Amino acid sequence: MQKKKKVDLVALQSPFMRIPQMPVAVARYLLDAGYTDIFQLQGRSAESLLEEIRKSSDLIPGADTLPALRLAIYFSENASNPDRSRLNLHAWQ
């Protein structure tokens, strides 16, 4: 019998999951850092968010965290008319 994988329903249901290709773990990191909505990321730098995440979480952020934060900031600042080519994690590597 296989173990069921633990699912983070709160992170999955958060507004951050409206961002295309947003990893669930990064949504969880943002929630743990005290952010509750996408608009709160406007004007922030990805590096400062990453530092806040490191301070607020016991987990070590993965390699996809910084590109995902850059994508989230871009989406928050351009939600009404984003460039589709930039709504991809690979565009932020």
Predicted stretch roles:
Residues M1-Q93:
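C-terminal extensions
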